[in-house]
Amino acid sequence: MYKLASCCLLFIGFLNPLLSLPLLDSREISFQLSAPHEDARLTPEELERASLLQILPEMLGAERGDILRKADSSTNIFNPRGNLRKFQDFSGQDPNILLSHLLARIWKPYKKRETPDCFWKYCV
């Protein structure tokens, strides 16, 4: 009986930090479904780039979301166009320009070999 009570207290002790985590407001989350037939044709690099394009605006909005909410707390309705305008006013930069700069750093151009006489590690 003593072991059962100590196990329950231990379980509740580990469960308590998980229950104290904040819940996300369902109005702020945008659900995006992608078509499976389109994703099947994309290369891994294109999938990575597409996932960055989807994730980055959400991350930027989460970082500055508290500041923007304090600035305009009168509206509780989610408006993506309005959030883009708020982002432009706050940072002074277009989000598309920021995304293109970040993606340009990731992309590496394909380099051809200088000597066509070499195959794999064997050169003639």
Swiss-Prot record:
Subcellular location: Secreted
Statement: the UniProt record of this protein carries the keyword Secreted: yes
Tissues where this protein is expressed: Brain specific.
Underlying gene: UTS2
Organism, as annotated: Homo sapiens (Human)
Function: Highly potent vasoconstrictor.
UniProt keyword list: Cleavage on pair of basic residues, Disulfide bond, Hormone, Secreted, Signal
GO cellular component: extracellular region; extracellular space; synapse
Pfam short name (any one): Urotensin_II
Protein name: Urotensin-2
Main location per the UniProt record: secreted
Family statement: Belongs to the urotensin-2 family.
InterPro entries cross-referenced by the UniProt entry: Urotensin_II (IPR001483)
